[in-house]
C-alpha cells in the first residue's frame, strides 16, 4: 500500500492471547458442527499458537442461511440508509485503528510478517481501504435513460446478494478488507473463509464487526480448509457471487464449481510471473531498489512479485552486482525482533516448493550469485537468493516461486523484451524503468498486464483498480471498478402518458 505520513512503530505486544477461535455466524461464536479443530502455527518458530474450530460444509450452510436471512427485503440491512452503511464501515476502521497494535502483532506471529511492515503497511492499508469504501456507500447510483417512446427508464445498482469470499494467507487481514469493504459498501452480505494457515486476524475482525454495529448475519466467518469449506462456498446453490485471491490452480476449481452449481458470479485474483523491464537509460539506483523490493518484499510471497527481471545488456553486469550487494544486506530472524529484515515462509509446503525451484535453477544452468538454500535450525527461513544468466526456458523463469528468489535476465531490443515479457500465461502486473516517456508509454501499452508501474513497483492504493489479464484472473478489486463486481444493474421502464425533454 502506498502511504504518506507514517506513524511511529511501537514495540509488538508480548504474551498475546488468542480470544477468538470459533466460527462467527449471526454475530455469535459457534463450535464446528463436526466438533473438529485445526492447529495454527507460528512459521518463525514452528510452535502451535492455538487451535481453531474447523468449519465444513454444514457450517458453511449455516453461515449462508444467516447471510441470506440478513439480505431479505425488509431486513435491517436492506432498509438501512446507504450513508449509514458508510458510517458502520468508518466505525469499523476506527476499531481497527484502536486495535492496530494487537492486529499487527497477530499478523507477524501467525503470518511471518515483519512487525513493522504489518503495523505500517498492512494495517495502514486496511484502514485506508475501509475509509475509501465507506465513502462510496452513498455514491453507488443508477441513471435515467432517454428511451424512445412514451416511457420513463432508469437503472438501479442493486447488491448482488450473498457473497462468498475466500482469503489468501499472504495478506490475511488486508485481503479480508479488500473483500468485505466493497461488498458491504454496496449492501451485500458475506460468508468469509480465511486461509487455514492464517485465520486469527479474520476471527478478531468478527468481534469488531459486532462491536461496530453491523446487523447479525451481514458478515459471517468460517475458518477451514479449501477442499472442504472453500469448496462448499464455491459450489453452494444459495451463494450469488464468490471472490477468491490465491493460486491459479485453485481459481480454476472455483470457476468450475461455480459453473456446475448456480453459475454464480466469480472474481479471481490469481498468480503472477510479473516482468520488470530495466532500460539502460533508467535511474539505476532507483531501478535496483524498486526491483529488489518488488521481489523480496514479504519474503517474495506476493502475487505481483517482480519475478522476471529483464535488464538491458549494456547495464546488465552492473545491475547484477548492485542487486547482489543489496540482497546480502538482509538480517533473517523472528519478524517480531527489531532489526530483522526477512522473516520465514508461511509453511513447510511452501518452503519445500521454493527450495525445489532454487535447485532447478542451479541444475538448469543459471548462475547462483548469492543465497540458494535454507537458513537457521528452526522456522521456514530461506536465504535471499539471486540468479543471473537466467534463460526464459528455465523453471525459475516460468513458474511462480513465491519466495525470496530474484532471477535476472538480459535483453537487447525493445521489441524482443516486449515479446518475452508477454510470453507467459500470467498477466497480473509489470514494471518499466526508463527516463524516456515515449518508451514508457509504448511499452506500457504493449504489456499484457492489469497494472503497469513506471519507475516504481508495487505501488497499490485503494483508489486504483487491481486485477489481472489472462490466467492471473478476472474482475477488479478496489477503485470505482471494484464496486461493479458487487452490484447488479436493473433496468426499470415505466409507461407514461407523454414524454417531454
From Swiss-Prot:
Q: Name one GO biological process term.
A: retinol metabolic process
N6-acetyllysine: residues bearing it: 91, 128, 252, 353, 367, 410, 419, 495
Locate the active site.
269, 303
Q: Where does NAD(+) bind?
A: 167-170, 193-196, 226-227, 246-247, 269-271, 349-353, 400-402
Which Enzyme Commission numbers does its entry carry?
A: 1.2.1.19, 1.2.1.28, 1.2.1.3, 1.2.1.36
Compartment(s) of residence: Cytoplasm, Cytosol; Cell projection, Axon
Q: Where is the signal peptide?
A: none
Quote the Pfam families the UniProt record gives: Aldedh
Residue positions of the PTM N-acetylserine? Answer: 2
Q: Name one GO cellular component term.
A: cytosol
Q: What class of enzyme is it?
A: oxidoreductase
Catalysed reactions, semicolon-separated: an aldehyde + NAD(+) + H2O = a carboxylate + NADH + 2 H(+); all-trans-retinal + NAD(+) + H2O = all-trans-retinoate + NADH + 2 H(+); 9-cis-retinal + NAD(+) + H2O = 9-cis-retinoate + NADH + 2 H(+); 11-cis-retinal + NAD(+) + H2O = 11-cis-retinoate + NADH + 2 H(+)
Modification(s) after translation:
The N-terminus is blocked most probably by acetylation.
Summary of the function given for this chain in its UniProt record: Cytosolic dehydrogenase that catalyzes the irreversible oxidation of a wide range of aldehydes to their corresponding carboxylic acid. Functions downstream of retinol dehydrogenases and catalyzes the oxidation of retinaldehyde into retinoic acid, the second step in the oxidation of retinol/vitamin A into retinoic acid. This pathway is crucial to control the levels of retinol and retinoic acid, two important molecules which excess can be teratogenic and cytotoxic.
Its family remark reads:
Belongs to the aldehyde dehydrogenase family.
Recorded protein name is Aldehyde dehydrogenase 1A1
Amino acid at each position: 500500500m502506498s502511504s504518506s505520513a507514517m506513524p511511529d512503530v511501537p514495540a509488538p505486544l508480548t504474551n498475546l492471547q488468542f480470544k477468538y477461535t470459533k466460527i462467527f455466524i449471526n454475530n455469535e461464536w459457534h463450535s464446528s458442527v463436526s466438533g473438529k479443530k485445526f492447529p495454527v502455527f507460528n512459521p518463525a518458530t514452528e510452535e502451535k499458537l492455538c487451535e481453531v474450530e474447523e468449519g465444513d460444509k454444514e457450517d458453511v450452510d449455516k453461515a449462508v442461511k444467516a447471510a441470506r436471512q440478513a439480505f431479505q427485503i425488509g431486513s435491517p440491512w436492506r432498509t438501512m440508509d446507504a450513508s449509514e452503511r458508510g458510517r458502520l464501515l468508518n466505525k469499523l476502521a476506527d476499531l481497527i485503528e484502536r486495535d492496530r497494535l494487537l492486529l499487527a502483532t497477530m499478523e507477524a506471529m501467525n503470518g511471518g510478517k515483519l512487525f513493522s511492515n504489518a503495523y505500517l503497511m498492512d494495517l495502514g492499508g486496511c484502514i485506508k481501504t475501509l475509509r475509501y469504501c465507506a465513502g462510496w456507500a452513498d455514491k453507488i447510483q443508477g441513471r435515467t435513460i432517454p428511451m424512445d417512446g412514451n416511457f420513463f427508464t432508469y437503472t438501479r445498482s442493486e447488491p448482488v446478494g450473498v457473497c462468498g469470499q475466500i482469503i489468501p494467507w499472504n495478506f490475511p487481514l488486508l485481503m479480508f478488507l479488500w473483500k468485505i469493504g466493497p461488498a458491504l459498501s454496496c449492501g451485500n452480505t458475506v460468508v468469509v473463509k480465511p486461509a487455514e494457515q492464517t485465520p486469527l486476524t479474520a476471527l478478531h475482525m468478527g468481534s469488531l464487526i459486532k462491536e461496530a454495529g453491523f446487523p447479525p448475519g451481514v458478515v459471517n466467518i468460517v475458518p477451514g480448509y479449501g477442499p472442504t469449506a472453500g469448496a462448499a462456498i464455491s459450489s453452494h446453490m444459495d451463494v450469488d457471487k464468490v471472490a477468491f485471491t490465491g493460486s491459479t490452480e485453485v481459481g480454476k476449481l472455483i470457476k468450475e464449481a461455480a459453473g456446475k452449481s448456480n453459475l454464480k458470479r466469480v472474481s479471481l485474483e490469481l498468480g503472477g510471473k510479473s516482468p520488470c523491464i530495466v532500460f539502460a537509460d533508467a535511474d539505476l539506483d532507483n531501478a535496483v531498489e524498486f526491483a529488489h523490493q518488488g521481489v523480496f518484499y514479504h519474503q517474495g510471497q506476493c502475487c505481483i512479485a517482480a519475478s522476471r527481471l529483464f535488464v538491458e545488456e549494456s547495464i546488465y553486469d552492473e545491475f547484477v552486482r548492485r542487486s547482489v550487494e543489496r540482497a546480502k544486506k538482509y538480517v533473517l530472524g523472528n519478524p517480531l525482533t527489531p532489526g530483522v529484515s526477512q522473516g520465514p515462509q508461511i509453511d513447510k509446503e511452501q518452503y519445500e516448493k521454493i527450495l525445489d525451484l532454487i535447485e532447478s535453477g542451479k541444475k538448469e544452468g543459471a548462475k547462483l550469485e548469492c543465497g540458494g538454500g535454507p537458513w537457521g535450525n528452526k522456522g521456514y527461513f530461506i536465504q535471499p537468493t539471486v540468479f543471473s544468466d537466467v534463460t526464459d526456458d528455465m523453471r525459475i523463469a516460468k513458474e511462480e516461486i513465491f519466495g525470496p528468489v530474484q532471477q535476472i535476465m538480459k535483453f537487447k531490443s525493445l521489441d524482443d523484451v516486449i515479446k518475452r515479457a508477454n510470453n507467459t500465461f500470467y498477466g497480473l502486473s509489470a514494471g518499466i524503468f526508463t527516463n524516456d516517456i515515449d518508451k514508457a508509454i509504448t511499452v506500457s501499452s504493449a504489456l499484457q498486464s492489469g497494472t503497469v508501474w513506471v519507475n516504481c513497483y508495487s505501488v497499490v492504493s485503494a483508489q486504483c483498480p487491481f486485477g489481472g489479464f489472462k490466467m492471473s484472473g478476472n474482475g477488479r478489486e478496489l477503485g470505482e471498478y471494484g464496486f461493479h463486481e458487487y452490484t447488479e444493474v436493473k433496468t426499470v421502464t415505466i409507461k407514461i402518458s407523454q414524454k417531454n425533454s
